[in-house]
Amino acid sequence: MAAGPAGIVWQTPANPPERQDYIFRDGRRYVRPYYFEFISHVKNRWAGKTIVDLFTDEFKGRPREYYVHAVKCGRLQVDDQMVHADYVVQSSQKISHFLHRHEPPVLGGDITILQNEADVVTVCKPASVPVHPCGQYRKNTVVGILQAEHGLVPLFPVHRLDRLVSGLLIFAKNADKAESFRQQIEASLLQKEYVAKVVGVFPDGEQTVNANVHFNAREGRSTAEVCDGDGKAPIGKQACTKFQRICTDGIHSIVLCKPVTGRTHQIRVHLKHIGYPIANDEVYLSENFSPRSSKGTRINRATTLACSLPSSDPDSCADLGNNDTNEDTEADEEFSIDPMCTNCPNLAPVGYDADEEALWLHCVRYTGPDWSYECPYPDWAFLDNVSRKKLKS
């Protein structure tokens, strides 16, 4: 635990997740909000800014008013010391941000352990759960949940799955085994297989898509790029995916997907490219998708909401963040409310998209030179009894 403003126990990345950290409600897994010390070091481009200007410019999830109060109350410190709002930071200084951390909820399904060997553990990852700590997620991750519920630590992810993708995940239990897997991946010795539920009747026979994948981080999605005949090489990275229809009911098809390369959103964008997008993929189903740059990222929407909070007395350290929302406030009985928190009294952080669902894309198999790991098919892959027999045969 970290030393911070008096009277509060502050967690750091060194504090492991525990089983009692989770709250289950309405089919979702929440993390009980907790006090946390975020530590960063002043980058060269930050040097010369005041502490308040720095956080206002770089961390837009909270309004400037919050950061002014945070400095005054010791929630923002430099080199473990309280400073004033006009303090100018210098390169490499340590900055601690003590805050009440709310993680986004994930779908409430269990993480099923498939195989637990001496050097390897494989699991079935539910959709919506990130593999490892990133962004707002720390405890609500596959790594965090496995540590809290099964005591599995350390774990080294052999591969990644996007947050909304479900299915097989392989972890090495030690650095040597992780390095062995890494070498096999670099030598292109692994075969990956996914299933997807797509719109329409997918063609019979193997379909191979060779189209560069260009990921636009600003828009939050990829595009498939091919040569348009003008002699210019297409942008993006070379990508190849092989597809095979497993079954169809005339409305949807279940398709086996074998990515030869591993680009961001490769399977999703290649399926869209050939006219058979994943049937519930909001990002690639429509050409009218509202990109991040036009509708605002989740963090920008959070900023807008936070800035609309009732203004507080500038001399008070206790009134900021008493946001009144429609979310069920029975959470008050399950965690402490922080008067400076811009998310309280809600369990989820401001701006969380409560409507997201599992993507119909699921990893079913990874095969190496002398090993193979598999994961059961999801319920959505069984279109009828015929498809159930095919998939289970």
UniProtKB/Swiss-Prot annotation:
**So which residues are the signal peptide here?**
none
Q: Which reaction does it catalyse?
A: a uridine in RNA = a pseudouridine in RNA
Keywords in alphabetical order: Isomerase, RNA-binding
Q: Does the keyword RNA-binding apply?
A: yes
Write out the GO biological process terms: enzyme-directed rRNA pseudouridine synthesis
Q: One MF term from GO for this chain?
A: pseudouridine synthase activity
Q: Which superkingdom, per the lineage?
A: Eukaryota
Where in the numbering of this chain does the S4 RNA-binding domain appear? 49-118
EC number(s) per entry: 5.4.99.-
What InterPro entries does the annotation carry? Answer: PsdUridine_synth_cat_dom_sf (IPR020103), PsdUridine_synth_RluA-like_CS (IPR006224), PsdUridine_synth_RluC/D (IPR006225), PsdUridine_synth_RsuA/RluA (IPR006145), RluA_PseudoU_synthase (IPR050188)
The answer, when asked if Metal-binding is one of the entry's keywords, is no
UniProt xrefs under PROSITE patterns: PSI_RLU
**Which positions are catalytic residues?**
D162
Q: Which family does it belong to?
A: Belongs to the pseudouridine synthase RluA family.
> What is the protein's given name?
RNA pseudouridine synthase 7
